[in-house]
Amino acid sequence: MVTPWRLSVRVCLSHLRCFEFRKELGHSRPLGCSRNARLCWFLLGTLPKLISAHGSVGEGAPGSLCQRKTHWSDLAENGLVEKVAQEGPLARVLLCLRLGLRAGVLLAKFFPLLFLYPLTYLAPGLSTLWLHLLFKATETSGPTYIKLGQWASTRRDLFSEAFCTQFSKLHVQVTPHPWARTEYLLQQAFGEDWGSLLFFETREPVGSGCVAQVYKAFASISLLEEDRIWRLGELSAPGTRAVVMQREPFMKDRKPSENLADEAFLEKLLLPKADLGGSEVGVSQAPWHLPKSDHLIPVAVKVLHPGLLSQVSMDLLLMKIGSKALGLLPGVKWLSLPEIVEEFEKLMVQQTDLRYEAQNLEHFQHNFQDMASVKFPTPLRPLITRDILVETYEESVPVSSYQQAGIPTDLKRKIAQLGINMLLKMIFVDNFVHGDLHPGNILVQGADGVSPSLEMQQQQVNVCDTLVATIAPALCPLRLVLLDAGIVAKLQASDLRNFRAVFQAVVMGQGHRVAELMLHHAQANECRDVERFKAEMATLVTQARKNIVTLEKLHVSSLLSSVFKLLMTHKVKLESNFASIVVAIMVLEGLGRSLDPTLDILEAAKPFLFKGPASFL
C-alpha cells in the first residue's frame, strides 16, 4: 500500500518521468555538467519511482527492481477473486465479463460433447470418434486444459484405458510468441544490458510447448562475476529473498553488496551507458553477436508465454466453480472433483513458475551425483526468474531414435537397463520421481563411444576411484539425460512402505494382499463389495502369472493397467502421487521392452523390495 507521503512525492515529481526517455531525446540534462550534478539530476527523475514502487530504500531495493508487481503467490494464496475485490468495483465488473466470455467459449466447445456422450454406448466407433473430438477440443482450449488432459491421462484409476491412451499423446507444439516478448522479459529480468550475459545466434526457438518456449543460446562465463548478477539471486528461489547460488566452477569470490548509499553504484544503476565515459562497463553487445567461444557455454533458455498467469488463474477459477456444480451429481460424487481441481492447481502453480523446475533439477542432481549414467541439465542459478530459466544445453539424441531397427541389440539393452535402474532409484531410494517421463523428455548421450572394453574400464573406475572417471571425459560414458523436471511425485513414508508392499505382493502372486493394500491406501472409495473386489484382484494377479515360466515374461504395465481398470470399476480412488508413480513404471517398462523385450523389471526391483534400498548403494 502506498503511504500518503510517498503518494505526494510521486505526484509532485510526476513531471520528471520524462527522464525515462533521456537516452533517446538526448536533452534531459545540460551537456558538460559535473559528475555529481549529473548524478543528482538523474536521481530526481528516478528515485521517486524507487520509493513509490518499493517500501524502503536500502540494499533490498536494487534486487527488487526486476520483480513483477503481480506474483503468482498472490493468486495462489489470496485467490483471484479476493485480489480483484481489493482493486475496486470496476475490476470486479471486468473480471465478471472476462469470466463470462471465457465460460461461453468453453461451453461452446465442450457442451455439445457432453450432450453427445450417451451415443458412445451405441457403438465402439462412436466412442472412438467422441474421444477424438474431446481430444481436439482440449487441444485448442489453452495451456490449462492441455495440462489438465496430460494430468488426467496419468489417472488410470479414474478414467478409462482408451481415454488415458488417447490423452497421453497430448504434447502440443504451439505457435511461438514473438521475439519482442522474449526480449522484453530478458530486459525486465536481467537489465538492459542482458546481451552481455546471453548471446542468441537466432531469434527462432528450438521448441514451443503450451506453457513455455525454449531457445538455444550461449552464456558468458566471465560476466557471471558481475556485481549485478548477485542481486538476481533474490529471484532464484520461490518464497524467499535469499541468494542461493552455485558458485563453483563459475564464481570464486563474492563481491560486497551494493546499496543506494554508494554513489558509484547509484551512477552505474541510474545513468545510461553513454554517460559513463570513464567506467569500465562497455556498451552491451547485440544479442546475436558472439564473442570468443572459449568464454561461452551453450545454454537452453526457457521463457514462459505471455499472459499465461492470467489465463491459468481464470481457468482454474472456472474449474473450481464447475467441479462444485458437477460434484452434486450422484454418479461422480465419489471422485471428489473439488479435491482433484485442488491437486491440479498445485501442479499448475509449479508449471507457471520456472524457479520450481530449477529447484527440482538441483534436487535430482544431488540424488544422482554418484551415478554417472544419469544426468540432468544444470540450472544457472543467477539467471533464473519466475518467467525465465537458463540451464546448460545438453547435446543428446532422443531415446525414441534407438527404438528403430538397425541399432545394436547390446546398446538397446544397456539403455533399457539404465532407464529401469534410474526409475527404481527415484522411487525406492530417493522418493523423488520425475513426473513426466515420456520419451520426449529422455535423451541419450555417449552411445557412439560404447564398447566392451570401455564398459569394463568404466566399471573398474567406478569401483576403485570415482574421481578418475570425473577427470577423464574422453571416455564418454553412456548415460541418460532427463529434461522438463517441472513435475515431480513423492510419497509420505507410510505410503512408500505401502507402495513397496504392493510390489512385493505382486511378485509373490498375492492378489488378496494387493487388494487390501489398495483399499488401505485409497484416498476415497465407494467399494460396495469388498470381498468381490479382493477375489477379482486375486484372479487378476493369478491369471497374469499363469503359464509363465519366468517373471521376465510378465508385462507389469499390462498387469497394472488391468489393476487400474478394476479400481475404476469398484470406485477405488488412489492418492495422486501414488497413481503417478505407478504410471511412471508403466511408461518406463513399455519403453524399456521396446528396446529390450527380455527386460525384467520385477527382477531388477527385488533388491529394493526384499533387501531394502541400502543394497542398491
Swiss-Prot record:
Domain Protein kinase, residue spans: 200-609
EC number, UniProt record: 2.7.11.-
Presence of the UniProt keyword Mitochondrion in the record: yes
The UniProt record lists the keyword Kinase: yes
Main localization category: mitochondrion
A Pfam family annotated for this UniProt entry: ABC1
Amino-acid positions noted as binding ATP in the UniProt annotation, renumbered to this chain: 206-214, 302
UniProt keyword list: ATP-binding, Kinase, Membrane, Mitochondrion, Nucleotide-binding, Serine/threonine-protein kinase, Transferase, Transmembrane, Transmembrane helix
Chain segments annotated as transmembrane: 103-123
Subcellular location(s) per record: Mitochondrion; Membrane
Membrane disposition: Single-pass membrane protein
Uppermost EC category: transferase
GO BP, sorted A to Z: regulation of ubiquinone biosynthetic process
Active site, renumbered: 436
GO cellular component, one term: mitochondrion
GO MF annotation terms: ATP binding; protein serine/threonine kinase activity
Consequence of gene loss (knockout): Heterozygous knockout mouse show locomotor dysfunction with increases in plasma lactate and accumulation of organic acids in the urine. They show an unaltered nociceptive information and emotional response. Heterozygous knockout mouse treated with long-term caloric restriction recover overall glucose and lipid homeostasis, have enhanced physical activity, increased mitochondrial function and aerobic metabolism in skeletal muscle.
Highest taxon, organism lineage: Eukaryota
Family in the record: Belongs to the protein kinase superfamily. ADCK protein kinase family.
Role noted for this protein: The function of this protein is not yet clear. It is not known if it has protein kinase activity and what type of substrate it would phosphorylate (Ser, Thr or Tyr). Involved in the mitochondrial import of CoQ precursors, plays a role in muscle mitochondrial function and fatty acid beta-oxidation.
Protein name (record): Uncharacterized aarF domain-containing protein kinase 2
Organism: Mus musculus
